[in-house]
From Swiss-Prot:
Predominant cellular place of this UniProt entry's protein: secreted
Organism the protein comes from: Hemachatus haemachatus
Active site: D93
Protein name: Basic phospholipase A2 DE-1
EC number: 3.1.1.4
Co-factor requirement: Ca(2+)
Length: 119
């Protein structure tokens, strides 16, 4: 779920608040359209697509689904025992948080004009 995703981001990118990713580029945050502005925005596009795939699992609501995971010294692990939906959503969030950690953050791409840059 989004709360757990926020905590996964805190695990992999402890130097930056999750809030910095909430309105970044064309895909980080609500919705998403157009061409991603950079690698970090592509991480968000991939995460959005992953959640769309999760929704194809019967009854799976990725924004609200809780799952079991562990964060140890910046390393994320989705725990055994998650059901199909929880395991899928955990993987989506884990891969995105790892992607965020490896991508450059460009302050100029935070709060961009979506109508102008994301069509």
């Amino acid at each position: 779920n989004l709360y757990q995703f926020k905590n996964m981001i805190k695990c992999t990118v402890p130097s930056r608040s999750w809030w910095h990713f909430a309105n970044y580029g064309c895909y980080c945050g609500r919705g998403g359209s157009g061409t991603p502005v950079d690698d970090l925005d592509r991480c968000c596009q991939t995460h959005d697509n992953c959640y769309s795939d999760a929704e194809k699992i019967s009854g799976c609501r990725p924004y609200f689904k809780t799952y079991s995971y562990d964060c140890t010294k910046g390393k994320l692990t989705c725990k055994e025992g998650n059901n199909e939906c929880a395991a899928f959503v955990c993987k989506c969030d884990r891969l995105a948080a790892i992607c965020f950690a490896g991508a450059h953050y460009n302050d100029n791409n935070n709060y961009i004009d979506l109508a102008r840059h994301c069509q």
